[in-house]
């Protein structure tokens, strides 16, 4: 299993229930054994450095996880089909 750092940004026009639902869906991928969430931070609504899909703000979320390849593939699949996610980055840690 490898360690990954993940950051994703949600559309700013979502209400808190929708933000929580999406966060829970994405985090559940890493809550199934043997995967685990090491750290998480729901940063909240922040200004974007530049417009993304005509949005000036977005809900930022950050995760540090240990995951196998299947979890990484499932996370990427979910992110790509979820329209509320306007940007994401998935980085493998050096460990």
From Swiss-Prot:
It comes from the Bacteria. Pfam families: Ribosomal_S6. Coiled coil: none annotated. The keyword rRNA-binding applies. GO terms for cellular component: cytoplasm; ribonucleoprotein complex; ribosome. InterPro entries: Ribosomal_bS6 (IPR000529), Ribosomal_bS6_sf (IPR035980), Ribosomal_S6_plastid/chlpt (IPR020814), Transl_elong_EF1B/ribsomal_bS6 (IPR014717). One of its GO terms (biological process) is translation. Keywords: Ribonucleoprotein, Ribosomal protein, RNA-binding, rRNA-binding. Gene3D superfamilies: 3.30.70.60. GO terms for molecular function: small ribosomal subunit rRNA binding; structural constituent of ribosome. The keyword Cytoplasm does not apply. Belongs to the bacterial ribosomal protein bS6 family. Binds together with bS18 to 16S ribosomal RNA. This is Small ribosomal subunit protein bS6. It comes from Onion yellows phytoplasma (strain OY-M). The lineage of its organism: Bacteria, Bacillati, Mycoplasmatota, Mollicutes, Acholeplasmatales.
